[in-house]
């Protein structure tokens, strides 16, 4: 498996300079990826939160090898054209190292309801499906005429295209027993299972394999809770491991400077 550091850009790590320091330490230590949360609020009490796209741009400039990206961006609260522009620019800035993690988002910190965003899960799912489809169409560089229930692109051409072709890799979050998010992920390039045990991951991957015919070329980015689960997930075919320190962890830089397999 490849190993990625998943950084909560909050508290002391809401400073992009601190995030760059962590990312460069991780690259030097042999990590394969550096990803960041995409939240606008976090926790019930006020806390500093960095913008993920500004942070990722800084990380892209400071690093040369690691894959980078958000894990995950709630597409339901973003305009697809704005996200298309941001992702293509970041893909060029990083020389084709961007992976885009997408999901429904959560409202536990009122980062949806607090700003009048859509909260209804069904509607968020519809917006996620439409938004992902529209993103891929805009990345194509072709003139598109898209009319969905939630988004419209009226005979427009969006350039430049991403460095990566046929598209920037799309990984989708999926939680627990929900089957629709797994099938959604199977239509794209990867899955980020959230809070799953070994049996649940096996069930998810069975769905993916049934949908795709094979797991070949499909990324599975897991967050194991320890060495035993790490090995079990690897046996099931996981391709990436996320190591996610606690938000504001003062030892984050030390973790980043550690050879990742030794953490398990």
What spans do the regions from the language model cover?
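Active-site-adjacent structural elements that line small-molecule/cofactor binding pockets in enzymes
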Residues: 1-264
